Amino acid sequence: MYKNIIFDFGGVVVNFNPRDFLMDHFMNHRAEEETYDIVFGSQEWQDLDRGIITREEANKIMLEKAAHANRVFEVQTCLDEWFTMLETNKTTVQIMRKLKAAGYRLYYLTNIPTDVMDELRQREWFSLFDGGIASCDVHLCKPEPEIFTTLMQTCHLAYDESIFVDDNKANAQAAYNLGITGILYKNPKSFTRALGACGIEVE
């Protein structure tokens, strides 16, 4: 019997689609790909998630790379405006409220930089969570098994009583490999169906 639902943030609770963001801003495939590699696909972005580099340090390195690639305008625009992507997925939050009202405990497990985590903590839906782990706080990232076990131990969760929801297949698979039921999030409708398959009705 499931008691705990564990949520990723980006792509699940808040919108996060860097490639769409870049396409909307530049509409130039080469510029989009090069900017993606310098920013979202970079080692610095991974280090931000892991909490081992500051935003200022990461931005400095990214802009140095941008100068070599002649992409300073694109990268600076991206660094200035990417936060606007992080709009709350209101339908997912509605599902979360229904789950909470039905007695399920909600947790988060997210790869996220410190400054983004600080901002999301201020959103009204954050109080729905009973606990969770942010990668920047423990210097671990999904899909590493250690971040899952850290969450389960810290929050005293039973593996067979927990469902993990993520928009990244590798992360959902990592949870499954540890004995946690994994749901690959695509949209609220498919998420609701997947919950139903687990015996959880939220309609």
Annotate each predicted stretch with a short phrase.
Residues 159-196:
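Acidic, Mg2+-coordinating phosphoryl-transfer loop and its flanking beta/alpha structural elements
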Residues 4, 141-169:
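Conserved Lys-Pro-Asp/Glu-containing loop-to-beta segment of HAD-superfamily phosphomonoesterases
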Residues 93-101, 152, 172, 176:
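Surface-exposed amphipathic alpha-helices with a cationic face
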Residues 8-11, 51, 99, 108, ...:
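Generic structural signal for small/hydrophobic residues in well-ordered secondary structure
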Residues 46-78:
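A metal-dependent, Asp-based hydrolase signature
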Residues 1-41, 193:
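Active-site neighborhood of HAD-like aspartate-dependent phosphohydrolases
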Residues 122-136, 200:
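Structural recognition of alpha->loop->beta junctions
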Residues 73-107, 145:
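Short, acidic loop-to-helix structural element flanking the phosphoryl-transfer center
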